[in-house]
Amino acid sequence: PGQSLNLQDNGIKVIVGQRQESKTWDKAIADGWEPGVSLFPIEEALEKASIICYLLSDAAQIQLWPTVKKHLTPGKMLYFSHGFGIAYSEKTGIIPPADVDVALVAPKGSGTSLRRLFLEGKGLNSSFAIHQDATGKAKDRIVSLGIGVGSGYLFETTFIKEVTSDLTGERGTLMGAIQGL
């Protein structure tokens, strides 16, 4: 919830979509999101949103894609924090329509760290990338979102470079591949 809470604290109107009767729905309520006001079932949130922050695991993004895709109307933005679904679209099937912006902000740390640093008045470095600029405003939109979520510094990349960097860091460092070599 770090990104959504930081955006809200920065004055952005945020709505959250979760599966009802789930732990994530209950957690959203515990985090202060109000059912029917700022918390909605996924499809209702998708319908209402102008920017869809697709912050699910890679596997969950693939599974939910048919539902998300039907709500991507012209001018909306599809926002990611990891580039896998787009970078490997031939495998994932995640191919957005041409009339929406597609971009990412990838904080270089967990949502918990992002939130903690935000509350301390600090920021977490993030990369940003634009896959598709249908509106001519994708860069302005994504940089604004990057600042809003609590990025201390933003550097431009591509979706494929973000995936390569992320997987190298996760697999090579956090999961011990370097130590195993």
Predicted region positions:
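Alpha-helical elements of the RecA-like P-loop NTPase motor core of helicases
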Residues: W25-D26, I62-P66, D140
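Glycine-rich adenosine-cofactor-binding loop
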Residues: G2-L7
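Structural signal for hydrophobic packing residues in well-ordered secondary-structure cores
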Residues: G11, A60, V68, L72, ...
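A short glycine-threonine-serine/GTX helix/turn-capping micro-motif
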Residues: T168-I178
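Rossmann-like NAD(P)-binding element
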Residues: R19-Q20, W33-A87, I95-S110
